[in-house]
Amino acid sequence: MPGFRFLLAATAAFLATSPALPLSADSLNAGNIRLVDPEETVPVIKIPDGIYLRTPNDPDDIIWARVPEFRVEMVMAPPVHPSVGLRYRDEYPEQDLVVQLARTSERFYVRLRWVDPTRDMSTLRDRFRDGAAIEFSESDDSVSYMMGTDAESPVNIWYWHPDGDRVESLAAGSPGSLTRLDRQPVTGASEYRTGHGPDDSQWIVVMSRPLASEGDHQVSFERDTIPVAFALWQGADAQRDGLKLVSLNWIFARMTPDAAPAPGN
């Protein structure tokens, strides 16, 4: 089986110097995780051909140890609807989201991780589920990062929630216009890691989609840079709908691929 042996050798070489992925939430503030400011540009790392995740969206695959992590500050979204204003509280804490962006010749990947002391899996009468999303401008950064500008300047949103470990591809042209798209090409998987204490527990989520886009409002990756933004929902804090944590303005994902670091570098 020479082909299989070649893939094993290529994977081993790619991962030869990979550090172990940290389990502690303290690593969210580690010195090697650079804080990204709004409107900064970050690379989408190219995973070499012949290197594969163990499963299509494996959150714990060692390949992620070769992809740089970036830290994004998340703050409470301003209330954009009276119903959100009624639930809004200034004391909601800010928090960090750690982001990794990667691609192969066929797929685009995003990996997110964040501290969450509680694993909130579903929405019931007085309980709410956790969630995370990445938002893509369908054109450029003139589009509002707060759910799009209008029907002519929309955004594509990948929304993950743990109820069934599902990812949905959505579109919006303004707050309150969120629509589930007919085509659902985005897939994902998650892992909840329990640490030594509540502040050491975290969600890790991977979402991905084929690079080729089919259907209306599915983001095109055939661009040098793509404006992206992020959102989190902490179910234990009764966050849902527009009551959420968001990144401040767009961050630019550079699709002109940077190769993953070679072993020994």
From Swiss-Prot:
Subcellular localization(s) per the UniProt record: Periplasm
One Pfam family linked to the record: EB_dh
GO molecular function, one term: metal ion binding
This protein's GO CC annotations: periplasmic space
Entry keyword set: Electron transport, Heme, Iron, Metal-binding, Periplasm, Signal, Transport
Keyword Transport recorded: yes
Signal peptide range: 1-25
Cofactor(s) of this protein: heme b
Entry keyword Repressor: no
Residues that coordinate or bind heme b: H81, M147
Note describing how the cofactor binds: Binds 1 heme b (iron(II)-protoporphyrin IX) group per subunit.
Main function: May transfer electrons to the iron-sulfur centers of DdhB.
SUBUNIT field: Heterotrimer of alpha, beta and gamma subunits.
Protein name: Dimethylsulfide dehydrogenase subunit gamma
Organism: Rhodovulum sulfidophilum (Rhodobacter sulfidophilus)
Lineage, top ranks: Bacteria, Pseudomonadati, Pseudomonadota, Alphaproteobacteria, Rhodobacterales
Gene: ddhC
